[in-house]
Amino acid sequence: MKKFLWIAFLSFCFSGVAAESDWNADSVQVYFSRSVTPVIQKNWKDHKLILKTYRRFLKICESVPDSVLKQCSWCFIDTYYNVACCESLMKRKKAAVDAFEKAIQYGYYDYAHAQKDSDLDNVRDDKRFQKAMERLREVGDFGYILRKSPGYDDAASTDSLP
């Protein structure tokens, strides 16, 4: 019965918003926080339902103008990263890596988190995932970026630092 009520609730939410023609960054973010986030929080172990919810969100966003999408890229960063995690947990490597690459494409940069996130353990041996992690390191591993920068002296004394 609970599942039926959730499905009915989601259908109601998605039908109302999908018909909306005046999308802006605020309406996308409000939709995400009211229609996506509660489902994820309540059903965080139901990977199929989570994927379905995220895919509906992405489907709706296909009709949103690019200018609006750029203003709320965090929604897509979170969505694609979490889709990658769900797909990995469900042992669907190709789909997981595809979603992970999309997260990076939209601006995901938390290299340290991706490196230790156990949800991604099933794809760590995938060559595409490893290449994506290398690309991510270039923008998200701040120690690595600092060490590569001109003038960085690894042997410099740090005694005077607080």
Question: Which stretches of residues belong to each language-model region?
Answer:
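Structural signature of alpha-solenoid helical repeat junctions
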Residues: 26-27, 49, 68-75, 110-112
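Pro/Ala/Gly-rich low-complexity, hydrophilic intrinsically disordered segments
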Residues: 129-159
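Flexible helix-coil transition and linker loops at the boundaries of alpha-helical arrays
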Residues: 20-23, 43, 59-73
